[in-house]
Structure formats: structure tokens, C-alpha cells
């Protein structure tokens, strides 16, 4: 049995879960970002990041690597297109989702997401910079969608990587209305059985987690990593980030453990 160390609110684990469900692969799920599961997570990934997939003696800790492994291990139904050109396109959009989209949405959502509970105000210009960059990516996606309404000829890892990020834009005040092809893509994605079931699962998880008297997650500190820090610094918010570090509200993983995609 495959074990997935995940979290219902992580876009990376949401992508992996949808790929597993797309391929009808049974798996055990562990909400590894819950404080109670922290030691179990560190045991398989010293950086304490999700997702982590364990299949027998094999441990894989990067979502793109997990997807690639699942495509090789369970080739049908495929989640990558058939032609080299479309495969490259799908991987390119997955990379945009995993790096740039994640960084922007993470950095401007700290004052929106209930998991963070920030009571201060964002630094001036941060949210506006995020909205501008998000709208630029949406314009690129609008131009990239094919005649079938997906990134490639049919639903692929590109769509499953983009959807968890783009489905959160409404909460951030970013509308898809100026992008009719993206709007139609969003409708088509929500009509897919795998995505429909996934959204119901996320909704149930949210109700369970936030209806509890005490959150199972660490709410006072935020984990930052390369892409998220890079986007922030590129837009001139070095002083704000340094203040977060000084106040102990930011966690930067420093482990350089070789326990990564470990094959005995």
C-alpha cells in the first residue's frame, strides 16, 4: 500500500492526490502537517514538507517527482500527453504552478487563509504586486489553452497542477472574468469526476479542521522556502521579511539531508 504524507490544503498534495485518484491507485493518507504527526513527517522528510510518497522501500519528497514516478509505475490512464511537444508543455505549466503560482499565492494569502490568523496588515504594495503577476499568468494561460479547453489535448498533469492554485483566486480577490477561456477551463475542470470528488474531500476537511475547538496546525509561524522568498525579495520586500525572521514568525528550512527520493 502506498502511503502519502499530505495535507488537504497544500496545493502540491492536492495535485498528487488527484493524480492517484485519476489512476485509481489506493493509498493511505496521513495529514502530516498536523502538529501531532510532525515526528512521523520528519522521519521520512527532515525538511518537514509535504507531500511525501512512500512505496515500500522507496521515499519520494517532491510533488513533480512523485507525479513522474506514478506515471511510470501506473502508466494507464496516462496523466502526461502522448507527444514530446505536449509533454514538454504540460511539464512547463506544472513548473509554473509549482514555483511561481505557489509563491505569489502563498505570499499574499497570509492575511486571508484561516490557517495563518494574521491580525496585522500586509506591507504596502505586496497584494497589488501579487495581483498584477497573477493576472499576467492568467493572460498567458488564456493564450495557451487549446481548442479542447485544456492546456494540452486532454486533461493532464498541467491542469491538475494549476487547478488547486487557481481555484483559490476568488478568496484573494482575483477574478477569472476577464479571461473567458480560463473561466471555461475552470468550469470544465470542476466537471471532471476526479476534481469534483477532490473538492468535496477538501470541503469536508476544512469543515472538520476549522470546526474543531483547537486547530491541529501551527498557526503562528509560516514556513518559507526558495521560490516564495525569491518572489518576495524580487518585489522589494526584504525589510519586511527580515522583520518576520527577527520576530520568529518565519521558518526557513535549512536541512540539507540526503534523504530525498531515497532508493536503498
Region roles according to the model:
Residues 1-128, 228-264:
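GST-like domain detector, emphasizing the conserved glutathione-binding G-site
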Residues 97-194, 252, 256:
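GST-like fold's C-terminal all-alpha helical module
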Residues 30, 63, 179, 199-200:
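Residue-level detector of family-conserved "landmark" positions at structurally sensitive sites
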Residues 73, 93, 172, 201-202:
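Residue-level signal for well-ordered alpha-helical positions
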Amino acid at each position: 500500500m502506498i502511503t502519502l504524507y499530505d495535507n488537504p490544503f497544500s496545493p502540491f498534495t492536492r495535485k498528487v492526490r488527484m493524480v492517484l485518484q485519476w489512476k485509481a491507485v489506493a493509498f493511505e493518507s496521513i495529514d502530516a502537517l498536523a502538529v501531532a504527526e510532525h515526528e512521523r513527517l520528519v522521519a521520512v522528510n527532515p525538511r518537514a514538507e509535504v507531500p511525501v510518497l512512500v512505496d515500500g522501500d522507496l521515499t519520494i519528497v517532491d510533488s513533480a517527482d512523485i507525479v513522474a514516478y506514478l506515471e511510470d509505475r501506473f502508466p494507464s490512464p496516462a496523466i502526461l500527453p502522448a507527444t514530446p511537444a505536449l509533454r514538454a508543455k504540460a511539464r512547463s505549466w506544472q513548473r509554473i504552478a509549482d514555483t511561481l503560482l505557489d509563491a505569489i499565492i502563498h505570499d499574499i494569502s497570509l492575511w486571508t487563509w484561516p490557517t495563518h490568523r494574521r491580525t496585522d496588515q500586509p506591507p504596502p504594495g505586496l497584494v497589488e504586486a501579487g495581483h498584477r503577476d497573477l493576472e499576467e499568468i492568467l493572460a498567458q494561460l488564456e493564450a495557451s489553452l487549446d481548442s479542447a479547453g485544456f492546456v494540452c489535448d486532454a486533461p493532464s498533469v498541467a491542469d491538475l497542477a494549476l487547478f488547486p492554485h487557481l481555484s483559490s483566486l476568488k478568496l484573494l480577490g482575483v477574478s477569472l472574468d476577464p479571461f473567458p477561456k480560463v473561466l471555461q477551463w475552470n468550469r470544465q475542470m470542476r466537471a471532471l469526476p476526479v476534481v469534483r470528488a477532490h473538492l468535496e474531500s477538501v470541503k469536508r476537511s476544512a469543515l472538520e479542521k476549522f470546526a474543531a475547538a483547537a486547530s491541529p496546525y501551527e498557526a503562528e509561524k509560516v514556513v518559507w522556502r526558495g521560490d516564495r522568498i525569491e518572489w518576495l525579495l524580487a518585489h522589494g520586500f526584504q525589510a519586511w521579511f527580515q522583520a518576520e525572521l527577527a520576530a520568529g514568525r518565519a521558518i526557513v528550512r535549512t536541512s540539507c539531508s540526503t534523504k530525498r527520493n531515497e532508493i536503498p
